Amino acid sequence: MRFVKVFEEAIDPGAVAELLESFLTRFELVQLVSPAWEELAYYEKNTRDFLFPEPRLASSHLGMQREVLMKTAIWFPGIAPKIEFSTRTAILECVFPCKNRFICEERCRLERSVSKSHGQRVQATNRKKKPKEKDSDQLPKGTQSRLPSPQRLHLHRPTQRNHGKSFKFPGERKPPFVVRHVDSGNPFGENNLEHCSKKSRRKPKLINFDLSKKRASSLDSLEANIKVIREPDERIVLKSQPPPPVDSSESRKPSLSHQGDASLHTETSVTTSQLSRPPSPLNQPLLQERFQPFSQSTWQKIPEGVRSLLTSHRAHPKDSFISETNSIHERPSYPLKKHLLRAQRYF
């Protein structure tokens, strides 16, 4: 027979021996026939002395072969029965087992939940630390989204050389239409030659003459030369003609000054003006004669010119163009100094 006993509170073999003294070991001799289950003899002793008996001088094999006499009952006839047996005891260290299976499962679940929550907290702290380390090495988001690709950067390199600090990323907004007014005393051809030399690698984009004329005429009169700029690289020059003279003595001085400006202007902007607009009807020989100082020859030629204009297919466009220029001349002119100051900001 084998008996196993677990002591939960014991730490060493000495504590186990002390605990064995509190337990009792008992052998009983019971009668099976009638009267049944009557006790005939018994043997009892504490478990420590039963398992670990004191040594005896007579016994040759200590613990291997043992003999004990049982105590008989009062009514039992005869001698006391004797028991021969051998015992072997071993004290082993073991892990404390759970009494209830459900309690063990609950403890395991609690341990797993605690370990998972601790792991999630560690991962969250690591994630919070990583973006801070990355942000110190990387650029802000706004600049990353605005950084151009290598092809765009290569295309914008000539503008960076020409304009210097005025280079902007393609994501930024460009300034609106810019109108610059130039004084008639300042030669306009010099600035135009410099810009043409810088922008010779790029072809200027052409726009319609009528649209550019309406935008320019709404800001200033046609007495000054007007320059409309779509972009820093796209510039188209519009040339204005002097208004029809009212007096022969007053119209000679401005006509000479405007002719001088026009001669310089045509030399520098031949490439853009010839491609961007059709020939002006004011350059027609008949209209030039009408705007010249009055004389007897002109008075004689006026009826013939009127007849030719009425019979030609261009009569209506010329009349509309002359009425439009007259309405523009009647508008008040703005001072040129303010526009010059605004123009210097973009150049």
Swiss-Prot record:
UniProt feature, compositional bias: Polar residues: 116-125, 254-277
Record-level GO cellular component terms: sperm head-tail coupling apparatus
InterPro entries listed in its UniProt record: SPATA6_fam (IPR042769), SPATA6_N (IPR032732)
GO BP term, pick one: spermatogenesis
Annotated GO MF terms: myosin light chain binding
Coiled coil: none
Alphabetized UniProt keyword annotations: Phosphoprotein
Location of region: Disordered: 115-199, 234-285
Highest taxon listed in the record's lineage: Eukaryota
Biased composition (Basic and acidic residues): 170-183
Pfam family, one: SPATA6
Identification of the protein by name: Spermatogenesis associated 6-like protein
Organism of derivation: Mus musculus (Mouse)
